[in-house]
Amino acid sequence: MWNDRLRIAESVEAEWKALAEDERALVRSALQTIDDDPIAGAPLFDPLAGLWSYRAGAIRIVYRIMSEARFVVILSISRAEETKQR
């Protein structure tokens, strides 16, 4: 399912399983967008400087762009309200 340029952190597996099928469809589309254009999301600021966030409906995807290695690491896929509580 994942493109060669996208790397998914192991911790995301549980988050993925917690999503409903319609949410997974949104995430799949969002991951394709991120793969096509990693800066499509918004850069985050302290204390998360260096990370990016992309919204897909109520889902927030947090990722890091590894420019020199030419890949993107997906660090979190969660409902936006859950992300705010972390």
Place the predicted regions along the sequence by residue.
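A short, surface-exposed loop/turn module that caps and links secondary-structure elements
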Residues: 29-55
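Enriched for short, Lys/Arg-rich terminal
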Residues: 1-6, 11-28, 55-59, 64-86
